[in-house]
Amino acid sequence: MENGDEHFRLGLKLARKGLWKEAVAAYKESLNLNPDNAQTYLNLGFVYYELGYDREAQEAFEKASKLQARPCTR
């Protein structure tokens, strides 16, 4: 599985099942392959929040916000 989107979808499935730590691993792998995906950082923040990792959640939310604020260019 070398596609960031596949890892993202796996993270979604794991989070829906409450498998938080496994979801973190999937989202982190997704970010390794696609580091500018704001939605992945947002989801990772929610998972960290569920785990009680407040500092990590805040960092993920801030990263998502910064990425989302980038202007679209082509």
What are these regions (language model features)?
Residues 4-5, 38-39, 71-72:
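Helix-start (N-cap) detector for alpha-helical repeat units in TPR-like alpha-solenoids
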